UniProtKB/Swiss-Prot annotation:
Bilayer topology: Multi-pass membrane protein
Topological region Periplasmic: 24-26, 83-91
Source species of the chain: Mycobacterium tuberculosis (strain ATCC 25618 / H37Rv)
Domain of life, source organism: Bacteria
Protein name: Arabinogalactan biosynthesis recruiting protein Rv3789
Gene Ontology biological-process entries: capsule polysaccharide biosynthetic process; cell wall organization
One Gene Ontology CC term in the entry: plasma membrane
Predominant subcellular localization, coarse grouping: membrane
Cytoplasmic topological segments: 1-2, 48-61, 113-121
Traits of the deletion mutant: Cells lacking this gene display impaired growth and abnormal cell morphology, since they are shorter and more swollen than wild-type cells. This phenotype likely stems from the decreased incorporation of arabinose into arabinogalactan observed in the disruption mutant. The mutant also accumulates decaprenyl-phospho-arabinose (DPA), the arabinose donor required for the synthesis of cell-wall arabinans. The lipoglycan fraction comprising LAM (lipoarabinomannan) and LM (lipomannan) is not affected.
Induction: Is cotranscribed with dprE1, dprE2 and aftA.
Length: 121
């Protein structure tokens, strides 16, 4: 349940910043998604390490998380771009593409963090 709450909070940070950067600031869509993903994942990592998994700081774990986030970064930005293109960048496509990209990355993150990363000492 803690992972879901943490993911929800990080998702709000990610989506909120994405919309502000893309729609309000006028940044290019992939750059907006990239920046919002980075801020959202840093938020998620800090909360997950301290609250969700209650893990002590670890250099090995930090490196593993950064590698995982690098992979999910590509998944997120790529899926978001693909979905927006397939849906012709309509206004309603923004949250749809975000949910698909975020949902896919969240599943990958949870499985790898639970099974591998937070078992590292």
């Amino acid at each position: 349940m803690r992972f879901v709450v943490t993911g929800g909070l990080a998702g709000i940070v990610d989506f909120g910043l994405y919309v502000v950067l893309y729609k309000v600031a006028g940044l290019q869509v992939d750059l907006s998604k990239a920046i919002s993903f980075i801020v959202g994942t840093i938020t998620a990592y800090l909360i997950n390490r301290r609250w969700t998994f209650q893990a002590e700081p670890s250099t090995a774990r930090f490196v593993a998380v950064m590698l995982l986030y690098g992979i999910t970064f590509a998944v997120q930005v790529g899926l978001n771009h693909l979905c927006l293109a397939l849906l012709h960048y309509r206004a309603w496509a923004i949250p749809v593409a975000f949910v698909i990209a975020q949902g896919t990355a969240t599943v990958i993150n949870f499985i790898v963090q639970r099974a591998v990363i937070f078992r590292i000492r």
